[in-house]
Amino acid sequence: MTAPASKLLQPITVGPLELKNRIMFPPLTTGYEERDGSIGERSLAFYERLARGGVSYIVIGDVAPVMTASPTPKLATDAQIPTFKALADTVHKHGAKVALQLFHPEYDVPGVGRMVMGSMAAAKAAQEAKAAGDEETFAAKMAESNEIRNQAYAKLHHDMQHFVNEASVEQLTQIKEAIAASAARAQQAGIDAIEVHGDRLVGSLCSAILNQRTDEYGGSFENRVRYALEVVAAIKEAAPQLMVEYKLPVIMENPDGTPRGKGGLQPDEACEFAKLLEGAGIDMIQVAQANHTGNMGDTIPPMGAMPYNWTLPVAERVKALVSVPVATVGRVVSVEAGEKILEDGAADIIAYGRSLMCDPDIALKAATGEPIRECLNCNKGCVDAIQNRKYISCVLNAENGDEATIAIKPGEGDKKIAVVGGGIAGLEAARVAAKRGYDVTVYEASDHLGGQIVLAAAPPRKDEIMRSVEYYEKILPGLGVKVELNHAASPADLNAADAAIVAVGAHDVVIPVPGADSEKVVSSWDVLAGKVELTGRAAVIGGGLVGTETAEYLLQHGCQVAIVEMLDKIAAGESETILPLIMSDFAEHNVEQHVKTRLTAITDEGVEAICTTEDGAEEPVKIACDYVVMAVGSKANAFDLDGVTVPVTCVGDCSGERTADIASAIRTAYHAANEL
């Protein structure tokens, strides 16, 4: 337990709203809305869970005021008002306030929409022709449909790059009017606030980099911010009862001093604009990173890419210039960090985005001092999903996105549960079983908890993964869970319980090629565990997650590295927000990347392999090296169940469902423990 928070839990007045604390859920695109953009049961359950956890202010991200093809919420017609009223009513039950972040995508929505509808109409005609046996018309209409669709995609791609400069004043006026109309609908639905999405189209117009217009919306600073101020005025006129917040996108600096982002404003201009926003009647300003680079990791950076609280310096500057509340967002992962920011007067409100997905009870736990499950900033379940237009989730929170159907159930009587293995799956199983009221003992054969997480934390930028293990080390004693280290569980240990969960993980494997038994061959797991220290040239066999991370680890320790990968891509499955960092590291250190290459032998000089060329031919490859590091996957560990008489469930890697995946380990463990 830690000391309860004080500053975070203080109420604050924001315009017409009284927020019960300083904890905010910032806008994140969830993908949970219905296909027509309305708020359905999945969205309601997700946002209600946040409100029930004590969050005072929730912002629904990327709400479109027009019917776009974009997979986001939409409040474009009066018919959608009832679902947003249901959202407001649901959140209000728990004392929270809710805002809609209104945005417009950077493209000609009607134009693209007409093309998409034309493609669909041609496809429908094709199917009708096929049903009538008219193959000639079917082929012609399908070709027409595909051609129109390709034209729509081409226009969409073009507009995303150039719409800011090509949009007519009439189009901009129509967009502004649509945003205002959506705000009026939000007010009618009982929504509490509107957040102006200062990025996207609005931010592009503000940007000296992207805005090349020569009319009243381009050129000078005053012209570039003109449209944003007009949007604010239109919203305030259309929905005078609502609090109006502005998400202020700023081009921050990378650790090396280079600018980060294109849309939005430079810090000095952002500070000047903040004063104009206050003069325009804005009730609150959220200082955030500008987007428009094509990679969500630039806006929501993964672990190790940017410092903690990385946007705070600009937020602090803005706060010194305005009298309205200022929110900060960006890698604030702990209650203690939020408290310190508020105590220092650097901001007024703390936006916990990914952190609240990981643990929606941050506010409740801040009041009691109970440890929170801190976000890893891995971006695997959340930001990658936003990037790829999928449902977001959190690798550590098995309930994420399924709050309507999943919750820890009360236990069924007094039961003793034996958990074999203290890796991440075993620890999650122990937590859930203990939460259900069961008497839980964890048996771990080694002298520490964490299993493969300890290895995963060894490569550069990955040490934050250890927060997952540290959470269990903090919380399990308070739940009454007994942990026995250096104890290899026996059948007697399991039989002393009423049921057992086996989470003994997996072990790495070696490709059985000539020379695989050479002394120069080492395991990637042993490298990451620090059991072997390599120097000179290393050939890493396997370019998946473990292989690429091992390669980075070796680079950090001064080795020259080559990677041999059978697939046509290095680091398949890695977070798309982390991958650019890895590739940059490889380029800087001249890492050889041999894709579509199969290991055939290990020799005294190095390794021999076969590379499949683009035309399908096979060519021999020889790579000189001092060491060969095997990173070719893992195999589930076996656990001897002879003599075990109680029910046993295998979870995590040893279940065979999927290896080397923290999300799968957590989810299999959660569900197994919840069914005991």
Language model: regions and residue ranges:
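A generic local structural motif
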Residues: 10-12, 44-45, 271-272, 313-315, ...
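Hydrophobic, well-ordered secondary-structure elements that form the walls
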Residues: 285, 318, 341, 353, ...
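Generic beta-strand/beta-sheet core signal
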Residues: 26, 101, 196-199, 247-249, ...
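Rossmann-like dinucleotide-binding cores of NAD(P)H-dependent redox enzymes
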Residues: 439-479, 551-599, 655-658
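A generic structural signal for alpha->beta connector loops
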Residues: 95, 241, 323, 346-347, ...
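Rossmann-like dinucleotide/flavin-binding elements
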Residues: 411-445, 484-492, 496, 503-513, ...
